[in-house]
Structures are given as C-alpha cells and as structure tokens.
C-alpha cells in the first residue's frame, strides 16, 4: 500500500482534502492516516452542504442493522480499551488473527459473497435512511459504502440514497 499512501499524501500536500469514513474493516487504523498522510478521518456520519445540496455521508457500518449479536461485537471492536489491548499484540499474531476472523466471516455467507440487494423494504441502509429522512427532510443525498452493492434509489422528489458498490470488483 506504500504507493497508495504516497498518493494520498501527495494530494493532501497539494491542499486537497481527503476524507475517510472508518468502517468495519478500518477501526484498527487509529490516527496513522491522519498523522502520516493528512487524511481527515470520520468515525461518525457527516452531514455537509456541497454546492447548495445537503449530503449525509457515512461508511454505513452499524446503521440500521437489527442483528443484536452484530451490535454487541461491533461495540466491542469499537472499544478504545479493547483496541489498545489488541494493538499490544505483535503484528505476527494480530494480523493473522484478523485475516482468519475475516475469512471465517466470509465463509458463513453463501458462496462467501455479500448478499445481493434485498429490496427497498429489507435493505438495512435503505430502511435506516427512510427513517432518518423523516426527521431530516432537507437532506438530498445519502451516500454509503459498507454494503458491497451498487444502488441509486430515489426516496422522494428531492432525496436519494446511493450505495457505492464494491470498489474491488466493480471499479
């Protein structure tokens, strides 16, 4: 990743703001990208105005997912205490543990793939967005990653939700 990190640094050195939304695979990166590359890290969703439009930007991890086991595990992974303890483990073991955990997680899914789009009334991020939109009707664009599907769905005459897709396979 050295060349990629170099390009990030090159962009920020030129004054370009690079924003990174931390997700389920990124919680362990700490402040490295900020200190070394000048990247602006976001641990929570961000609402911002761009060219007169309201944007709600987020990774998407944990938003609207009803799975209680997932929520418990997520809260443990996001614990600063547990992150500090994990960082004390030598990378020889911690990296292997992380890779094994991710492999096991993928194997639990059919064919090891992310589930396809589940439809407007079952997709967690869409349901979350519809609910959020009720109390924040001025937001024009909700943009997420997390789910490895591509989606562009109009929610109203002035609001849409976009899920960016799988950047490895589709871009």
How does the language model describe each region?
Residues 60-124:
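Active-site-proximal loop/helix segment associated with metal-binding centers of metalloenzymes
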Residues 14, 50-52, 134-138:
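Glycine-rich phosphate-binding loop signature in dinucleotide/nucleotide-binding domains
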Residues 11-18, 23-28, 109-112, 128-133, ...:
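A generic short-segment signal for beta-strand/edge and adjacent turn/coil regions
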Residues 1-50:
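Core catalytic region of metal-dependent phosphoesterases/phosphodiesterases
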Residues 9-18, 96-100, 116-120, 139-140:
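Short low-complexity stretches enriched in small and charged residues
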Residues 38-44, 56, 61, 65-73, ...:
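Conserved beta-sheet core of the metallophosphoesterase superfamily
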Residues 2-9, 41-49, 107-120, 166-170:
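Short, Lys/Arg-enriched charge-dense amphipathic segments
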């Amino acid at each position: 990743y050295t060349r990629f990190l170099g390009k990030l640094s090159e962009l920020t050195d030129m004054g370009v703001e690079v924003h990174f939304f931390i997700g389920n695979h990124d919680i362990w990166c700490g402040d490295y990208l900020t200190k070394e590359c000048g990247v602006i890290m976001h641990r929570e969703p961000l609402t911002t105005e761009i060219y007169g439009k309201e944007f709600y930007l987020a990774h998407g991890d944990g938003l609207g997912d009803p799975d209680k086991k997932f929520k418990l595990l997520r809260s443990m992974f996001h614990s600063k205490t547990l992150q500090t303890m994990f960082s004390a483990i030598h990378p020889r073991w911690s990296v292997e543990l992380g890779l094994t955990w991710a492999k096991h997680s993928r194997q639990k899914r059919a064919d090891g793939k992310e589930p396809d789009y589940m439809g407007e009334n079952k997709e967690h991020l869409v349901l979350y967005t519809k609910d959020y939109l009720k109390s924040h009707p001025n937001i024009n664009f909700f943009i997420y990653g997390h789910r490895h599907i591509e989606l562009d769905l109009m929610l109203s005459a002035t609001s849409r939700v976009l899920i960016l897709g799988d950047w490895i396979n589709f871009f």
